[in-house]
């Protein structure tokens, strides 16, 4: 836990810097001394041996430094990115991200964590995202709102990186209010967030239909076309509604542009404008400069939680392009979609389903058939694998370690939230995809080529399953032995602490190992 609090201004950091500096200086001095005493006739072997010895000495010094700053040199070196207020209080922005292809269970962890946070934020995507939260047997479905809205003491921020379809957003608020949740005065929208219009959604559907069997598999929520308008610099932002004449002029121009670009597209401009004029006051009452607000909340020492949407493998840059979303659901979106600096980030929590699922098209190396009586059917049926947004049946497969390592490399996860472990109950065996092979050779990195990724072989490790119900387990040691072995093996393969373990669908069905659980304490009760 000391590492999480480790500050650049601390004595340990200064001492550590001196230790590293001394080790490097010693290495340089020794190298110079050995060089000056050698001759052209000296063989290379003694020189190589001396370099090895020097490197070993440097390694020992670095290990000593690790012990100094971390307390336990055998523990997993968690990142220390928390900031310190003038009063000495440590704080930072924590992030929950999807580590696979989405639908990992991010919303549940956000709901669990958000009870202790002051601000919950969304930073990317739009109503194509979907989170389902179960509280006291009651289901709440979120698409644009952060799941943290269920915490009555938290304010919710929709950042500038999100694209917002106002009708869907207002319907979501009305549905929430009808469920007895009071959101008034707690939901803020960035004035810089771009708008999704109905014609964006129609264009989205047309583009998918035009692609035929090569379709991307989008949700047809207009996300891609809205981001296209943003990049083309002709889009409208939420803040534009604060100046009606400006909004009306720009909206008419955008409609004309789309009607000229898409044959047969007809937009009822006057009807659309009438709707936005009706809701403008309501939207404007929630519209603020969220960049200024969020940073001021940070400086005031407020705890901030970012809820990621979609997932890394759907990232426009890092995902299985072109079968991706149109935004960056990886860690970079927190900076660009909320307007905060990197030094303000603290915990980066990767949410990983115990098996893989995917909605839509694209490569899926560990995919299983969903035929009756197969492991794939078990995962699909027991896991209720149907999209929150689309209702489509999700594709299912075994956990994919190469994909997970790639995701961890990009995001720098400090802890893992392993969800839906309970779905494995009743399976005689479970598998973990350990490595990719292509043309008989192991791949050392995630291939960018879809042709390669679609044709990789997967090397699996088979572990025994379990039959016991784990939904009532509250501690790690209460889990069946085979379940524990599975979790520990995944942790070992990833090299990242698994802090949270999902054992059921309800809000409380989570084992939290606590912040101090690292690789050195695996298998012990914290």
UniProtKB/Swiss-Prot annotation:
It is found in: Cytoplasm. It catalyses: IMP + L-aspartate + GTP = N(6)-(1,2-dicarboxyethyl)-AMP + GDP + phosphate + 2 H(+). This is Adenylosuccinate synthetase. Keywords: Cytoplasm, GTP-binding, Ligase, Magnesium, Metal-binding, Nucleotide-binding, Purine biosynthesis. HAMAP family: Adenylosucc_synth. GO terms for molecular function: adenylosuccinate synthase activity; GTP binding; magnesium ion binding. Plays an important role in the de novo pathway and in the salvage pathway of purine nucleotide biosynthesis. Catalyzes the first committed step in the biosynthesis of AMP from IMP. IMP binds at residues 103-106, 128-131, 219, 233, 310, 325, 392. Substrate binds at residues 388-394. GTP binds at residues 102-108, 130-132, 394, 420-422, 502-504. Belongs to the adenylosuccinate synthetase family. SUPFAM superfamilies: P-loop containing nucleoside triphosphate hydrolases. Mg(2+) binds at residues 103, 130. The active site is at 103 (proton acceptor), 131 (proton donor). GO terms for cellular component: cytoplasm. Pfam families: Adenylsucc_synt (PF00709). It comes from Phaeodactylum tricornutum (strain CCAP 1055/1). Binds 1 Mg(2+) ion per subunit. GO terms for biological process: 'de novo' AMP biosynthetic process; IMP metabolic process. The lineage of its organism: Eukaryota, Sar, Stramenopiles, Ochrophyta, Bacillariophyta. Its main location: cytoplasm. InterPro entries: Adenylosuccin_syn_GTP-bd, Adenylosuccin_syn_Lys_AS, Adenylosuccinate_synth_dom1, Adenylosuccinate_synth_dom2, Adenylosuccinate_synth_dom3, Adenylosuccinate_synthetase, P-loop_NTPase. Homodimer. Pathway: Purine metabolism; AMP biosynthesis via de novo pathway; AMP from IMP: step 1/2. Its cofactor is Mg(2+). Its EC number is 6.3.4.4.
């Amino acid at each position: 836990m000391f590492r999480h609090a480790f500050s650049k201004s601390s004595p340990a950091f200064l001492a550590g810097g001196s230790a590293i500096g001394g080790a490097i200086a010693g290495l340089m001095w020794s190298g110079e001394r050995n060089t000056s005493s050698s001759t052209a006739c000296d063989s290379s072997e003694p020189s190589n041996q001396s370099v090895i010895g020097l490197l070993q000495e440097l390694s020992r010094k670095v290990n000593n430094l690790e012990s100094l700053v971390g307390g336990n040199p055998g523990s997993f070196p968690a990142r220390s990115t928390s900031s310190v207020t003038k009063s000495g209080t440590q704080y930072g922005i924590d992030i929950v991200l999807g580590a696979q292809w989405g639908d990992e269970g991010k919303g549940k962890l956000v709901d669990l964590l958000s009870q202790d946070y002051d601000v919950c934020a969304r930073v990317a995507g739009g109503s194509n995202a979907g989170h389902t939260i179960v509280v006291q047997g009651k289901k709440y479905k979120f698409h644009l709102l952060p799941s943290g809205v269920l915490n009555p003491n938290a304010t919710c921020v929709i950042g500038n990186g999100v694209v917002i379809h106002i009708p869907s957003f207002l319907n979501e608020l009305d549905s929430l209010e009808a469920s007895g949740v009071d959101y008034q005065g707690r939901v803020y929208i960035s004035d810089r967030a771009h708008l999704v219009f109905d014609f964006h959604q129609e264009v989205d559907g047309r583009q998918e239909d035009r692609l035929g069997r090569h379709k991307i598999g989008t949700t047809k929520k207009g996300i891609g076309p809205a981001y296209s308008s943003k990049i083309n610099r002709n889009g409208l932002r939420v803040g534009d509604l604060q100046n009606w004449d400006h909004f009306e002029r720009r909206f008419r121009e955008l409609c004309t542009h789309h009607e000229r670009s898409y044959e047969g597209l007809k937009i009822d401009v006057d009807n659309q404008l009438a709707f936005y004029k009706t809701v403008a006051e309501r939207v404007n009452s929630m519209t603020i400069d969220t960049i200024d607000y969020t940073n001021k909340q940070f400086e005031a020492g407020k705890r901030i939680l970012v809820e990621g949407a979609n997932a890394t493998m759907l990232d426009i840059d890092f995902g299985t392009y072109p079968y991706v979303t149109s935004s960056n659901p990886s860690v970079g979106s927190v900076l660009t979609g909320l307007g905060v600096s990197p030094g303000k980030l603290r915990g980066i929590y990767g949410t990983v389903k115990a098996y893989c699922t995917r909605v839509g098209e694209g490569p899926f190396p560990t995919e299983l058939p969903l035929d009756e009586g197969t492991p794939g059917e078990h995962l699909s049926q027991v896991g209720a694998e149907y999209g929150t947004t689309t209702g489509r049946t999700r594709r299912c497969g075994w956990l994919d370690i190469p994909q997970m390592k790639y995701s961890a490399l990009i995001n720098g996860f400090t802890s893992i939230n392993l969800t839906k472990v309970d779905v494995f109950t009743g399976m005689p065996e479970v598998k973990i995809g350990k490595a990719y092979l292509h043309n008989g050779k192991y791949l050392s990195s995630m291939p960018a080529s879809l042709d390669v990724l679609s044709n990789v072989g997967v090397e699996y490790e088979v572990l025994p399953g379990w039959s016991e119900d784990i939904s009532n387990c509250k501690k790690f040691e209460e889990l069946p032995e085979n379940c524990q072995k599975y979790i520990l093996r995944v942790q070992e393969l990833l090299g990242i602490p698994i802090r949270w373990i999902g054992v059921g669908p309800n809000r409380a069905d989570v084992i939290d190992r606590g912040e101090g659980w690292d690789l050195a304490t695996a298998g012990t009760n914290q």
